[in-house]
Amino acid sequence: TLEVLLEEEVEIDGKAYYLGHSREYVKVAVPKTEKYGVNDILAVKVEKTLQPHILQGEEIQVL
């Protein structure tokens, strides 16, 4: 798991995501929902590579 600070809303391949960075500066996108937003910190389980240099993750918990 990674702790990710959500920094911006983006659209990738027609889907809405929040994009942020982990403490190690890894760029992570999580699907946009009403449960969290920009400036929230999430515990994220990485699922796959979404684009070069961007991982896709699933929210485990809002911290």
Predicted segment positions?
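Terminal RNA-binding accessory module
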Residues: 1-63
